[in-house]
Amino acid sequence: MVTINDLHYSDPIDEDNIINMRIPLYDLEVDDQFINHNVPDLKAFQVFPNVWVVPERYTFYSTMKNLDAPANPSRSSYYDPTYLQSDAEKEVFLQQMILLFKRINSTQEGQQFLNLLSRSIPVPYESNGDVAMGTTQVIKQMDDKGNVLKHRRAHIIIYGPGPDLMAKGSKALTKSRETGRGCMAEIYFSPMYHKTYSTKLTNKNSLVDKSVQEFVPDPAVTLIHELCHGLHALYGIDLGNVGSWEFNSNPNSLFSSWFSSKEAVNFEEVMTFGGEDVKVIKSEIDKKIPGILNLIKTTVEPIINKITDPHDEMLQCLQSKYPSLKGTLGQFFFDDTQLEKDIRDLWMVMNETMFAENLKALTRARYLVPKVENIVQVDILSPNVYTIDKGFNHLSKGFKGQSVSQSYFRKISALARGAVVRACPNPHFSSQRGLSSCIEILEDDLFIMSSKDSFTDTDFSEPSVGPVSYKAKKGADTILDSTLSNYDFSKEINFTSTVPIITVEDPLETDEDVPVISEDRTVYVDDYTTFHFLEAQKIGKEVVPTQTKVVFTTNMEEALFDSKKVYTVFENTASRINEAGTGIANGMMFYQWLKGIVQDFTEEATQKDTFDKISDVTMIVPYLGNILNIGNDIRKGDFMGAVELGGVTILLEAIPELTLPVLIGLTIIEDELEKEQVSQTVYNVLDKRDEKWEEVYGFVKQQWWWMVHTQFETRILHAYQALNHQVEAIKANMTYQLANYRGNQEDKELLEKAIDDTLQSLYYAVDQAMHNIKRFLIQSSKSYLLNQMLPKTKEQLLAFDQQTLRNVNDFINKNQGVLGESLAKDLKKKVEKRLTSLPVFNLEDLPISEFEDLIHSHEIDIQDSEVLNIGVNNGKIQDLSGENTPLTLGENLHIVNGRDNQAVRLNNQLDSKLEIQSRPNIHFTAFEDFSISIWIRCSMLRNNRNRGQKYTIIQQFNKYGWQLAIQDSVFVWTLHDTFNNQIQLTSGSALTNKNYLLQNFWLHITVTNKRSEKSRLYINGVLQDQKDISVLGNCHPKEPILFSIQDNSDPNYFVRFEQFNVYRKALTDSEVNRLYWKYFEGSYLRDVWGERLTYNRDYYMQLSTLPGRGIKREYRTWSGFDYIILSELGTQKIPTHEVTYPKLYQGQKITIHSDGKNLEPHVKSNKNIRLKIDDFYIGVVNPFKLPEWRPESGAYVVTTYNHAEDLCLYFRTRSSSQSLYYGQLIMNDGRNKSLLNYTLKGSTYWIWSSAWYYENYNTSSKTAGNWYFIPVDEGWKED
């Protein structure tokens, strides 16, 4: 594990970890137009070996000298010339960087990554037999007079930000960054200033809490992105010049007016970001691999084999850097397969997305996110804000710690709004559409599509194929390793403080990246666009919601030119809002109006329809075309009809001009060859042909991803904008009605809360709607690839195959004399067969996981919606959900043995209580669905005064709220709203002689509440009762959730509970069932109450078919044996009910012992046990030895015999039921398995072991072989 040094800016220079450093480019022989030669030597801090932090602004180049804001700043930029100028600020910067490195170092993957950065020295140079570092691979340590003291290793140097505080970047300090040699890298970075993004395109969309609409990335993850660039520079595998996608559009073209002009995205950026984008460039990586491997081998092997000292520092570093090096001193060589795997790991695994997963942080799903929402400032040094183990998310689940709404994020105003496109009516065209004014569109809201130029230069030509054995690329088969298990960092390397150097010709990088600044522009249109429809859904900027009622209209043109009107496609929602007169008369009416809005909007926004016209698209969102102006030119107002006619192509803003690969059939060398060489050449051609198909497939995927799928993603974001515009307009109306409320003014505070609740419900509906929209659009994108793009490409490939076939046949014919006629025919058959077998278009190479994640993300896992989990952990009662909810514990609250581990015991006393403090996460709105579940065990009622009395166990109540109570052993769930309306659910009939075990038995209670439908009560996963609750109002006071027994007259009554959970959703029937059964995933046997069966504990035993009769030991004089029989029937009356039940504590106690091979305290199914009664082990005898028995194969009578061990029997246990908690005991005599049960002979119930029973009844719930194990428990009393 790397040790992160704790350093402070005020610490004196120690010539070790704190030095005076000269910037690496200072001595570059160029004029001041490029390098700022006025930069003094800087104080540098080595936070871990070879990684340095310099708390200074990055101002060393001509374009970065001036810290003032430029005249035309880019969007989302922020300038502050005073930042990082004082020693105090430099100390803060240093501590922030140390904290981020400690966070990265907190996981195994992070430790490996930092080890790589520390040990991966650039490959040294050789001069006159000496091996040393080049001058461009080290930094100069200076004295206070400006003299060079020594040269030091520096792999990564991290500075503060340049002039733009929002800009983060890295720079490889040599032009030969792709040569396999490697070089140091500089990073400029700010841990304090961050851009924010919408949660709609994230790496963990389904896990994000619905309240999080916008998030701030974890700065540790952002730093890792830049460090990955540095790692590539150290290995000399930087892909910065390999390829890129251009997004510059022609501003004079109307077609390109709706597409953004963005900076080019190069392959290196995609690799260091990771995620799904990497899959799309995999074919490019496959092509690059052979050249990179060759460069590394030809660079490293000659150098490392010049080193003669086995203890040499550079030798140790190179061996650590390249675990694929094999051999001994002076004779090192690379294992090609392992080297390829290691390089693929560095490219494909070490990236921002992987580390975001590793650190459990939210990040973008795509590198090319269309829009930065805001910029924020945050102090991560506060432990209440950011921690080493969890970053921002240390106090909450659902990534709420990264929500921009958190108080510790301070929004700051960017200097630029970004470029604007003004869409104005064409002055030379008399439009009948009524276009009369301009609208403004932000550049960042435009569609994104890579230009055709990004793909036109791709070269698919191949050199002539020869007989040299050819190794096909197998990159797709490589298993990537995020833990870098092939690397061994256990051996310490003591880095020397002085590095020998050689002056070499290795020019430093002098190119600078100049950001693309988009300019404002005007375009002239003849018809309405998507952006006009979006504009029509916005409220006018001049509208004051408290003074003006916003009217909803289904006429887009009317809304576009009237700021007080908003266009909508949701007619029911519009009617409900528009028909409400100004000033609602009373609180109940206002509340019902709000509730109706939620119901109408949710129903209309989440609508979807099945779709069978296109095989790849299974559902459609019918209103999508009308809110985004899609398909109106084909079937106005009929989006489904338009898609049926035009296919998914109509969803594109522009049909891209795709580049078809230019393919020429493979050619073959003309040399004279021997028979084996001719055959090998033919096989090489076939392998090369398959590889060419894969290469072209990859090319098609790239074009689809960057020219087609980006348009579908923009549609997704436009849909999200439209739905949010609808919510904002509804919010304005609610504000207007509240300002003009005519009822009791004291109600206003409650109505404000109700409006907040309504907004949360509306945003939840938007989220549900977006799941449908994403599913539809992503399926459509995939359909376009498979049905529009792929067939055209296959035509090219088939023509390529035909030409290749002719070339191969010509080659075979020319060499028939060498091959012989028979072998020539055989080769031709193999060629024809191979070329008729088409390589499959591999969907796994698509970002297919994105499709599956988005399609199924509405199926949120139960655990992901959990917001509270009260249980016992290490002897402490606490919230186990990760939310750390504050608890108040009464003095008479006890921790006892529970169903699985430990439980909480409530006594019927005032100081026996548990309060769960209310917080937003468990305080639901009047419209939010929620569920609760709990394992609970209530002791037997023994006081007659409790008959008919309802007593409460759990509640969140203060004049209104919810309660879980018991009445005559029946569970009662109550919801009571603020208007004094209530509903009650019950768990069934009262106690009878059949369900007497409902008392003192562990039961799983679940209540689900779907506010627009029903509340449902379940016991052990089975539905007991359900009622409509759509008419109820708010049932959630801000009171704590209280566990306390109230209104019970029995002072000895108590309740045990564990696993009290609250979920922010209404669990479905299947989820309730799954939640119950997941508690039985272990193989433990359970006693009659539901707790784990325990070794060395006393139990009564009864058969489930003969309750009230326990086993006992009885001596029979005529045989001289003690036998195990069933006792007489015992009964008991429950004091509080007219119920007589079979006694449980009947017969004699037995003790369970293990077979001596088991160390666990609890009994598992399929384990061997021994049973002891009266200090005698239970055994068996053959029944034919007894006079009144007939011989029967595989049958034994159970007995005991003094203390003799020869009759001791090992029974194998088996769990028979998970709901009634009984088990079976099986004996194996070596020939037959027999089941322990009973048989009635005369008046005696004999216990015996029968093979016939096992064969016929071993799976029946009614068999006489199912045994209850009954421990004495204080919750169950018998006379």
Curated annotation (Swiss-Prot):
UniProt feature coiled coil, ranges: none
Ranges for region Belt: 476-525
Domain of life of the native organism: Bacteria
GO cellular component: extracellular region; host cell cytoplasmic vesicle membrane; host cell cytosol; host cell plasma membrane; membrane
Enzyme Commission no: 3.4.24.69
Region (Translocation domain (TD)): 435-843
A Pfam family: Toxin_R_bind_N
Disulfide bonds: 424-438
Residue ranges of the region described as N-terminus of receptor binding domain (N-RBD): 860-1080
GO biological process, alphabetically ordered: proteolysis
Free-text comment on the cofactor: Binds 1 zinc ion per subunit.
Residues that hold Zn(2+) according to the record: 225, 229, 269
GO molecular-function terms, A-Z: metalloendopeptidase activity; protein transmembrane transporter activity; toxin activity; zinc ion binding
Keywords: Disulfide bond, Host cell membrane, Host cytoplasm, Host cytoplasmic vesicle, Host membrane, Hydrolase, Membrane, Metal-binding, Metalloprotease, Neurotoxin, Protease, Secreted, Toxin, Zinc
Keyword Hydrolase applies: yes
Reaction it catalyzes: Limited hydrolysis of proteins of the neuroexocytosis apparatus, synaptobrevins, SNAP25 or syntaxin. No detected action on small molecule substrates
Record region (C-terminus of receptor binding domain (C-RBD)): 1081-1279
Active site: 226
Residue interval(s) of motif Host ganglioside-binding motif: 1250-1253
SUBUNIT field: Might be a disulfide-linked heterodimer of a light chain (LC) and heavy chain (HC).
UniProt comment concerning the protein's domains: The light chain (LC) has protease activity. HC has 3 functional domains; the translocation domain (TD) and the receptor-binding domain (RBD) which is further subdivided into N- and C-terminal domains (N-RBD and C-RBD). The N-terminus of the TD wraps an extended belt around the perimeter of the light chain, protecting Zn(2+) in the active site and may be a pseudosubstrate inhibitor which serves as an intramolecular chaperone for the LC prior to its translocation into the host cytosol. The RBD binds transiently exposed coreceptors on the host presynaptic cell membrane.
Further details from the record: There are seven antigenically distinct forms of botulinum neurotoxin: Types A, B, C, D, E, F, and G; this protein has not been tested seriologically. New subtypes are quite frequent. This strain was isolated from cow feces in South Carolina, USA, but whether the cattle were infected with botulism is not known. This locus includes a number of other genes usually associated with the botulinum neurotoxin cluster in Clostridia (botR, hemagglutinin genes and p47 proteins), which might permit the toxin to survive in a host.
Family recorded in the similarity comment: Belongs to the peptidase M27 family.
Protein name: Botulinum-like toxin eBoNT/J
Organism: Enterococcus sp. (strain 3G1_DIV0629)
